[in-house]
């Protein structure tokens, strides 16, 4: 423990005229009152108020605040009384110690209403004397540093309260270093596995880049010295919680983070800040969109600094913060360092927050809410809306508060309420109006989720959400839906396979064959067959070892191609496939004599081409809605490709052949456009007709079909269709995927 003279010396370093008598008297009084009391760790209880006092000396606070820290637990935990403290230390210190005692008692209960009342009293106390906040935050910081000795449930409750209230409150009041440490300690107990993983990765990265950081630090210092700027440069690394939060909110992996390292440049004057900025930007390239000037436009908590990001050595992104030394002190200690309580306070109370400054407008507005008699729980939730600048808080129709990262959508909201609600979400009302599911939510929005039992979350939702929980749930639901589809497909294939083999079939019959197939359960077998990973003949043989499959694929034995129940089209690339007429169930026919439909009379709807050059589409086809590019073919005109076509890689080194073209479509457009679809379907009677019927039902023209591969269970085909536009094509592919006969369907590009 810190000795009495050591405490006095710590304060004397920044305040030579310290009132030693006050510190000595508070030290001795608190030590005697706490006596032989022990903390949960077994340490003397007096070590706690002493450590709280030490934290405040690091913030260069006056002796009265240090004395309050030493005394802050005496009324609650010892025989000390308010009257006694008033007599020994004065009524001002006695009032603050008693106020902190009342707040301390409320900390022991986790009910939301009590927590809300705690926050109300804390904010009201801060408005009267900012030292309440300083001692309270230092008290919470030391408790968090020693939280490991507590029961797990109590650790979690205190850590969550710290993350929810105290860390953002410290940030709001400009005390960034304390906010970061509170967040890191809370993160360690709320999600220990993630904390450990991120911490280990950061340590590895720091060791790997130590030399690079030293080089940049040296280069910066030399540049400033040569140009007559007195500056100190210090490298810094993002904290684990900051890294984890960015990974979660932006859906990034650790490897995708590009600004883990940064540098803080401290100079003497504001003019030097801008001179240093100019030197940095003339030495290294800056990253567009990453410059922020908080000197000319300070943050609400009076934070001032210039932020910029450069491309440093090894092409790494490096963030730099440029500020004066006074700005750095305010950024580190916030209200504790700010002149707001040193020389801007009222004459009666130099520690009262001034109502004239703009530095704490948020706190003044919040205190005004208190006088309006808000319900305590409502006040807690509304205050949280303001505490978390990087989060949005929305409400269910019943008033439940849901916290989400900025950029969250109604889909994130639905999954935050419950996974089942997310899985069944088909729409949302935001503040009573039906809004698109991609709508970005704002603070205070009321969100009502519209549900359907038949809904299955589409995979495309993954790109719309901002939370890891929603993303993981969508992936899980998508996998489950796909697995269910493949299982149904596998069931149909196996029913036919066992029927051909003359063997009875049921799910239970498959169980004895699981070890031979190296599958964990029957559903796994069905899905594997449906995906085409496991041939149906192997399953029959696993159940009936004596079974012999006499069939061969049409690839190896073309003579079998005409066998009943199987289909294959020889030289199909030269044939024209006609969509059947006559409605549902009509048969599909192949007409070798048919010809490709003639193009429409209107010229190709492409702008940006030379009218004297012939224009054609690439074999894989581009349709309206695609981004397109033209490639000049010497002696053959211009070929139009969809921008995603792999064939374009052949022209990467020939930029002179690329032509900027675009669609020129009007409502009277009557032409169809060619596109190519790859389909894998069950090799059974009726499958081809079902595929053709889907095309016909969607007003698409199939003008060519070729078999890419035929196997006992599946056949893979390439279908050339003519469609109106990209939406038309996507609708056809979507319905093909939903067909019970189709294993997969996708567009072919190139």
Curated annotation (Swiss-Prot):
Protein's UniProt name: GTP pyrophosphokinase rsh
InterPro entries the UniProt entry points to: ACT-like_dom_sf, ACT_dom, Beta-grasp_dom_sf, HD/PDEase_dom, HD_domain, NT_sf, RelA/Spo_fam, RelA/SpoT_AH_RIS
Residue ranges occupied by any ACT domain in the UniProt entry: 676-750
Organism: Brucella abortus biovar 1 (strain 9-941)
EC number, UniProt record: 2.7.6.5
Domain HD: 45-144
Homology family: Belongs to the RelA/SpoT family.
Disruption phenotype: Cells show morphological abnormalities such as branching and swelling forms. It does not grow in RPMI-1640 with or without 10% FBS. It shows decreased growth until 48 hours in RPMI-1640 and stationary growth until 48 hours in RPMI-1640 with 10% FBS. It has the same ability as the wild-type to internalize at 0 minute but a lower rate of internalization at 30 minutes. It shows a lower rate of intracellular replication within macrophages than the wild-type. Its adherence is four times higher than that of the wild-type.
Domain TGS: 390-451
Region (Disordered): 587-613
Keyword set, alphabetical order: ATP-binding, GTP-binding, Kinase, Nucleotide-binding, Transferase
Gene Ontology cellular component list: plasma membrane
Enzyme class per UniProt: transferase
An annotated Gene Ontology molecular function: guanosine-3',5'-bis(diphosphate) 3'-diphosphatase activity
